[in-house]
């Protein structure tokens, strides 16, 4: 399984590709700054869990079809859960990031709703939520998002 895109859409999920996501993030930051509105990001990571050992991107190649089904099902739930003004991108083989116009409370609620909807046998899902601070650059925001502690989805919602 390869991670490929045409610059606008991911070839597997048809979610936004990284270049399109980064351009839209810059645009949304400018709009939020001008309108003094809130902007949040949600980062989702999915991983295979075998006997308590998590297999991440490095171990993907051996079980392509199972991963593809998991990735596609997660992407479909994301597409069905977001509003038309929000943007969801696949930024890595198992990483999805959402730009959401709204507060961290709204973002957390959406993240938990998505993870409650997506239960895939043998896979775990994690998320982190970040609210953009005024004056932050795209790079600062993405670095902060990468450093956020991931929350494990609880199976018993």
Regions found by a protein language model. Give the residues of each.
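Hydrophobic/aromatic micro-motifs used in signal-transmission helices and low-complexity FG repeats
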Residues: 12-13, 48, 96
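Heptad-repeat coiled-coil signal-transmission/dimerization helices
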Residues: 18-21, 25, 42, 68-71, ...
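Short, conserved charged micro-motifs
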Residues: 50-54, 105-110, 140
């Amino acid at each position: 399984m390869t991670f490929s895109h045409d610059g606008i859409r991911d070839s597997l999920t048809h979610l936004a590709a990284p270049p399109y996501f980064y351009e839209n993030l810059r645009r949304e930051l400018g709009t939020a700054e001008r309108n003094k509105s809130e902007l949040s990001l949600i980062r989702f990571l999915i991983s295979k869990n075998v006997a308590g050992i998590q297999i991440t991107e490095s171990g993907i190649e051996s079980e392509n079809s199972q991963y593809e089904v998991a990735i596609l099902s997660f992407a479909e739930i994301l597409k069905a859960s977001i509003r038309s003004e929000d943007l969801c991108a696949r930024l890595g083989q198992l990483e999805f990031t959402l730009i959401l116009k709204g507060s961290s409370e709204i973002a957390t609620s959406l993240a938990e709703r998505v993870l409650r909807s997506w239960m895939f046998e043998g896979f775990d899902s994690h998320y982190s939520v970040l609210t953009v601070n005024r004056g932050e650059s795209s790079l600062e925001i993405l670095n902060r998002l990468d450093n956020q502690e991931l929350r494990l989805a609880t199976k018993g919602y």
